[in-house]
Amino acid sequence: MERGINRWLIITAVLAAAFAALAFLIPGESLGSSKEGDEYFPLCEYISVDLLKTDVTVIPYEGDRIRMKYRNDVPLTAELGDNSLTISESGEFVVSLFANEHESYGMYLYLPREYYRDILIYTVSGDVTLGDVDSEKITTVTNSGDITSENTRSLCSFSTASGNILLDFYSVITGSAVQSRTGNAEIVFPKGSSVALD
């Protein structure tokens, strides 16, 4: 019996070494465990993003369609509604035997330089970076992810439990709110602006 156990231990060690060598010989490849996508959608005034740990970057651009580009453990799904786009993670379950380069994971949402009514982004642990998007309202909520907004020109509501917030106003919008329970919050106002904080 002991010989049988030793034989299985040797076989397991050889297979583990073979998998490690394969992962080393193919650097940067996820060996089928990551999902990638690059999709285009018509303009919508209402945009909602609901993800777990995927970082979200919103980039304004000169195109005429909304573009979603991503690399993630599970595929992202997009659902078009009445003047709305909802992006979420699919219910597909993925188990990976290999360590992935998670720093290259994330979702990039390219928004045409138009006016939007409402943009809502929710992540559990992903970071959110917002470019100078023009929207009536932008709401971003994370549990532990950081929120960075550059050249903000929209009414915004940013909330995180333990992440950090950097809000850089292009012009101050009355009624904007920032809340971070245990993280840091930094607000940059335009020169010459008059601001009252509550």
Where do the PLM segments sit?
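Residue-level signal for short, function-critical loop segments
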Residues: 125, 144, 182
